[in-house]
Amino acid sequence: MTHLSKEAVIVRSALEAKGLETPMQHSSLSAQEKKQQIEQHMTSIMTLLGLDLADDSLAETPHRIAKMYVDEIFSGLDYGSFPKITLIENKMGTDEMIKVQDIGLTSTCEHHFVTIDGKATVAYIPKDKIIGLSKINRIVNFFAKRPQVQERLTQQILVALQVLLGTDNVAITVTATHYCVKSRGVMDASSQTTTTALGGVFKSSAATRHEFLSRA
């Protein structure tokens, strides 16, 4: 059984309490067992599509997809891979906005399993704790590495940072291109979707909200 960090447990519990957790079922399968079963199913799917898996270009594709799903693009389904979080006391008394802009993220649309490609901007006003800057990027990418809808992704990042930092004063905006819109259906290659999640003073103060959004 995978040992979960204290931070992973409190973040997961907070998301469950707010109804913001990704719809998931508990699985007792190991990562290797998941990969084996996914590989088998992908072999069946590709065969049904009429692809020749005896061809050397396709022979390893089911294995590659299985490994990619479990170890890479859906690794955020496993809280055992939640990033190690570094927090320090706010001894400097910082009480102004800290913002990390243009955090690159790649996720997967849970409706069609195609790419969501975009950027996030994250800001918070410290209370008692300050988080290592790279940890913000890692938290964004942890939640991106799941089948997602952008609205939930944005809220998950917000709640995770709020509980870790011990403050409601957190703000997130995500702007992304959805390949379920770009590469199929309406096939609109130019549109982007922006979602915002605001907490604490970012929600209650028009001036603080404007400061965040005007530079997001």
UniProtKB/Swiss-Prot annotation:
The record's listing under InterPro entries reads: GTP-CH-I_C/QueF, GTP-CH-I_N, GTP_CycHdrlase_I, GTP_CycHdrlase_I_CS, GTP_CycHdrlase_I_dom
The answer to whether keyword Hydrolase applies is: yes
Q: What class of enzyme is it?
A: hydrolase
Q: Its GO CC terms?
A: cytoplasm
Endoplasmic reticulum among the record's keywords? no
Q: Where does Zn(2+) bind?
A: C109, H112, C180
Q: A biological process (GO) annotation for this entry?
A: one-carbon metabolic process
A Pfam family annotated for this chain is GTP_cyclohydroI
Pathway annotation from the record = Cofactor biosynthesis; 7,8-dihydroneopterin triphosphate biosynthesis; 7,8-dihydroneopterin triphosphate from GTP: step 1/1
User: Catalysed reaction per UniProt?
Assistant: GTP + H2O = 7,8-dihydroneopterin 3'-triphosphate + formate + H(+)
Q: Name one GO molecular function term.
A: GTP cyclohydrolase I activity
* Record keywords, A-Z: GTP-binding, Hydrolase, Metal-binding, Nucleotide-binding, One-carbon metabolism, Zinc
Give the EC number(s) listed in the UniProt record: 3.5.4.16
Q: Spell out the subunit comment.
A: Homomer.
Q: Which family does it belong to?
A: Belongs to the GTP cyclohydrolase I family.
**What HAMAP family does UniProt report for this protein, alphabetically?**
FolE
Listed name of the protein: GTP cyclohydrolase 1
